[in-house]
Amino acid sequence: MLLRSLVGSLTRQWSQFARCAASLSLPAVGAQRCLSTITAAAVPFRAVVNPMFKPHTAFLSPLLGRCQQLLCVQPSAGMKTKSALKKRCNECFFVRRRGRLFVFCKAHPRHKQRQG
């Protein structure tokens, strides 16, 4: 039962990687993230199949490259919650939705804010 779920998980990861590799519009960082999810999923699978397996960092490091540190720290795409909203640039604009005030920016999406 456990082996079947692990195999299913790996096939999903491979299909996801194939989709990432097929679309040329993704940047290189996106492709490296796909590789990192596959290698991260393959290590526990090998450890279950062969308990004496020890992952080789030499195998993982060329695949991950400089994005190895990005596995732990991923930027979130959420909104900042503030009590006093301000326009941070000329492109920012205010919107009132659901009784709250929001700031959106098409030029710099990191300027998104929500009144809290």
Curated annotation (Swiss-Prot):
It comes from the Eukaryota. InterPro entries: Mitoribosomal_bL36m (IPR052143), Ribosomal_bL36 (IPR000473), Ribosomal_bL36_sp (IPR035977). Keywords: Mitochondrion, Ribonucleoprotein, Ribosomal protein, Transit peptide. It is found in: Mitochondrion. GO terms for cellular component: mitochondrial large ribosomal subunit. GO terms for molecular function: structural constituent of ribosome. It holds the Pfam family Ribosomal_L36. GO terms for biological process: translation. HAMAP family: Ribosomal_bL36. Component of the mitochondrial ribosome large subunit (39S) which comprises a 16S rRNA and about 50 distinct proteins. Belongs to the bacterial ribosomal protein bL36 family. This is Large ribosomal subunit protein bL36m. It comes from Danio rerio (Zebrafish).
